[in-house]
Amino acid sequence: MPPQACVDSGEITLNPSWKYAEFSKINSGAAVLYRSEAASPKGITVCVNAGHGTKGGASVKTQCHPDGTPKVTGGTTGAGATSAAAVSGGMTFADGTPESKVTLSMAKILKDKLLAAGYDVLMIRESDDVQLDNIARTVIANNASDCHIALHWDSTTNNKGAFYMSV
Protein backbone atom coordinates (compact mmCIF):
# COMPACT_ATOMS: atom_id res chain seq x y z
CA MET A 1 0.00 0.00 0.00
CA PRO A 2 1.47 3.41 -0.94
CA PRO A 3 2.13 6.04 1.75
CA GLN A 4 -0.82 8.28 2.49
CA ALA A 5 -1.18 11.59 0.69
CA CYS A 6 0.10 14.67 2.51
CA VAL A 7 -3.17 16.55 2.98
CA ASP A 8 -3.31 20.01 4.55
CA SER A 9 -6.49 22.10 4.15
CA GLY A 10 -7.34 20.32 0.91
CA GLU A 11 -3.84 20.70 -0.54
CA ILE A 12 -1.87 17.63 -1.53
CA THR A 13 1.87 17.93 -1.98
CA LEU A 14 4.40 15.49 -3.37
CA ASN A 15 5.42 12.98 -0.71
CA PRO A 16 9.14 12.26 -1.27
CA SER A 17 8.66 8.64 -0.18
CA TRP A 18 6.20 7.87 -3.01
CA LYS A 19 7.52 5.69 -5.83
CA TYR A 20 9.21 7.81 -8.55
CA ALA A 21 8.91 11.05 -6.51
CA GLU A 22 12.69 11.38 -6.44
CA PHE A 23 12.74 11.95 -10.21
CA SER A 24 10.65 15.14 -9.98
CA LYS A 25 12.63 18.37 -10.32
CA ILE A 26 9.80 20.92 -9.93
CA ASN A 27 7.61 20.05 -6.95
CA SER A 28 7.10 22.99 -4.59
CA GLY A 29 3.45 23.40 -5.63
CA ALA A 30 0.35 21.58 -4.43
CA ALA A 31 -2.76 20.03 -5.91
CA VAL A 32 -6.14 20.81 -4.33
CA LEU A 33 -8.64 18.14 -3.29
CA TYR A 34 -12.37 18.95 -3.48
CA ARG A 35 -14.95 16.70 -1.84
CA SER A 36 -18.30 16.33 -3.58
CA GLU A 37 -21.35 17.49 -1.67
CA ALA A 38 -23.71 15.69 -4.05
CA ALA A 39 -26.59 13.71 -2.56
CA SER A 40 -25.08 10.44 -3.82
CA PRO A 41 -21.28 10.62 -3.53
CA LYS A 42 -19.40 8.03 -5.60
CA GLY A 43 -16.43 7.60 -3.26
CA ILE A 44 -14.12 7.98 -6.27
CA THR A 45 -11.47 10.67 -6.68
CA VAL A 46 -10.74 11.89 -10.21
CA CYS A 47 -7.52 13.82 -10.79
CA VAL A 48 -7.97 16.62 -13.34
CA ASN A 49 -4.67 17.87 -14.74
CA ALA A 50 -4.87 21.06 -16.83
CA GLY A 51 -1.84 20.50 -19.05
CA HIS A 52 1.11 22.90 -19.07
CA GLY A 53 1.15 26.00 -16.85
CA THR A 54 4.46 25.66 -14.98
CA LYS A 55 6.65 28.75 -15.23
CA GLY A 56 10.22 27.68 -15.98
CA GLY A 57 9.16 24.11 -16.76
CA ALA A 58 10.37 24.17 -20.36
CA SER A 59 13.96 24.92 -19.30
CA VAL A 60 14.23 21.95 -16.90
CA LYS A 61 14.76 18.39 -18.18
CA THR A 62 13.28 15.29 -16.54
CA GLN A 63 12.69 11.72 -17.63
CA CYS A 64 9.89 11.30 -20.18
CA HIS A 65 8.32 8.65 -17.95
CA PRO A 66 8.83 8.36 -14.20
CA ASP A 67 10.17 4.81 -14.59
CA GLY A 68 12.80 5.91 -17.15
CA THR A 69 11.34 4.02 -20.11
CA PRO A 70 11.64 5.69 -23.54
CA LYS A 71 8.72 7.31 -25.34
CA VAL A 72 6.98 5.04 -27.81
CA THR A 73 5.28 7.83 -29.74
CA GLY A 74 6.62 10.88 -31.52
CA GLY A 75 5.61 14.49 -31.09
CA THR A 76 7.46 17.44 -29.59
CA THR A 77 9.81 14.91 -28.02
CA GLY A 78 10.61 12.10 -30.46
CA ALA A 79 9.96 8.40 -30.02
CA GLY A 80 12.79 6.72 -28.14
CA ALA A 81 13.68 9.79 -26.07
CA THR A 82 14.15 9.28 -22.35
CA SER A 83 14.27 12.96 -21.28
CA ALA A 84 12.20 16.01 -22.14
CA ALA A 85 11.06 19.36 -20.78
CA ALA A 86 9.70 18.96 -17.25
CA VAL A 87 6.57 20.77 -18.47
CA SER A 88 6.49 22.11 -22.01
CA GLY A 89 4.97 25.46 -22.86
CA GLY A 90 2.35 23.83 -25.06
CA MET A 91 0.97 25.15 -28.32
CA THR A 92 -0.57 28.50 -29.19
CA PHE A 93 -3.94 28.77 -30.93
CA ALA A 94 -4.33 30.87 -34.08
CA ASP A 95 -5.84 33.72 -32.03
CA GLY A 96 -2.78 33.79 -29.75
CA THR A 97 -4.36 31.96 -26.80
CA PRO A 98 -1.90 29.60 -25.09
CA GLU A 99 -2.83 25.95 -24.64
CA SER A 100 -2.34 26.29 -20.87
CA LYS A 101 -5.17 28.83 -20.67
CA VAL A 102 -7.57 26.63 -22.64
CA THR A 103 -6.76 23.47 -20.67
CA LEU A 104 -7.28 25.39 -17.41
CA SER A 105 -10.72 26.57 -18.57
CA MET A 106 -11.62 23.02 -19.57
CA ALA A 107 -10.37 21.65 -16.23
CA LYS A 108 -12.51 24.06 -14.21
CA ILE A 109 -15.63 23.09 -16.17
CA LEU A 110 -14.83 19.38 -15.80
CA LYS A 111 -14.23 19.84 -12.04
CA ASP A 112 -17.69 21.38 -11.58
CA LYS A 113 -19.38 18.63 -13.61
CA LEU A 114 -17.59 15.84 -11.73
CA LEU A 115 -18.38 17.34 -8.31
CA ALA A 116 -22.05 17.70 -9.27
CA ALA A 117 -22.08 14.04 -10.36
CA GLY A 118 -20.74 12.91 -6.97
CA TYR A 119 -17.03 12.50 -7.69
CA ASP A 120 -14.29 13.99 -5.52
CA VAL A 121 -11.83 15.98 -7.63
CA LEU A 122 -8.10 16.48 -7.27
CA MET A 123 -7.14 19.58 -9.25
CA ILE A 124 -3.47 19.65 -10.25
CA ARG A 125 -3.59 23.26 -11.45
CA GLU A 126 -6.12 26.03 -10.73
CA SER A 127 -4.17 29.09 -11.83
CA ASP A 128 -1.77 30.16 -14.57
CA ASP A 129 1.14 28.58 -12.69
CA VAL A 130 1.64 25.53 -10.50
CA GLN A 131 5.14 24.43 -9.63
CA LEU A 132 4.61 20.73 -10.32
CA ASP A 133 6.39 19.03 -13.21
CA ASN A 134 4.85 16.16 -15.17
CA ILE A 135 6.45 13.57 -12.90
CA ALA A 136 5.14 15.25 -9.73
CA ARG A 137 1.68 15.54 -11.31
CA THR A 138 1.63 11.84 -12.21
CA VAL A 139 2.99 10.67 -8.85
CA ILE A 140 0.47 12.79 -6.92
CA ALA A 141 -2.36 11.50 -9.12
CA ASN A 142 -1.26 7.87 -8.71
CA ASN A 143 -1.19 8.20 -4.92
CA ALA A 144 -4.16 10.48 -4.22
CA SER A 145 -6.78 9.62 -6.85
CA ASP A 146 -8.49 6.70 -8.53
CA CYS A 147 -7.94 7.97 -12.07
CA HIS A 148 -5.99 10.76 -13.80
CA ILE A 149 -7.29 12.85 -16.68
CA ALA A 150 -4.63 15.05 -18.31
CA LEU A 151 -6.10 17.67 -20.64
CA HIS A 152 -4.04 18.67 -23.70
CA TRP A 153 -4.35 19.94 -27.25
CA ASP A 154 -1.90 18.99 -29.98
CA SER A 155 -0.25 21.33 -32.46
CA THR A 156 0.60 18.73 -35.08
CA THR A 157 -1.50 16.59 -37.38
CA ASN A 158 0.36 13.35 -36.69
CA ASN A 159 0.50 11.13 -33.61
CA LYS A 160 -3.11 11.85 -32.64
CA GLY A 161 -5.11 9.74 -30.28
CA ALA A 162 -5.68 8.90 -26.66
CA PHE A 163 -2.75 7.46 -24.75
CA TYR A 164 -2.84 5.57 -21.49
CA MET A 165 0.06 4.85 -19.16
CA SER A 166 0.16 3.24 -15.76
CA VAL A 167 3.23 3.25 -13.55
Annotate the PLM regions.
Residues 1-167:
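Catalytic-site microenvironment of enzymes
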